């Protein structure tokens, strides 16, 4: 289950997988793969499990992605 401190690999349809480290707001550094649990993607990931689909409303529009792995 995704929580703060998890390293999560997600994949949107037709895109390569991306890995993010979910951190607290003060530790966020999106350019280095560290996203806040309060960000749209981070919030959508919280409490999800491998194989689940999550949706997030981002500045670029709504995205849907599958959780590939959680470490």
Where are these regions (language model features)?
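Non-DNA-binding regulatory cores of transcription-related proteins
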Residues: 1-66
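Short, compositionally biased
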Residues: 67-71
């Amino acid at each position: 289950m995704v929580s703060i401190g998890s390293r999560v690999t997600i994949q949107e349809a037709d895109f390569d997988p991306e890995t993010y480290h979910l951190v607290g707001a003060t530790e966020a550094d999106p350019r280095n793969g560290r996203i806040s649990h309060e960000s749209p993607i981070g919030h959508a990931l919280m409490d999800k499990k491998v194989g689940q689909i999550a949706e997030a409303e981002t500045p670029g529009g709504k995205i849907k992605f599958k959780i590939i792995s959680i470490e």
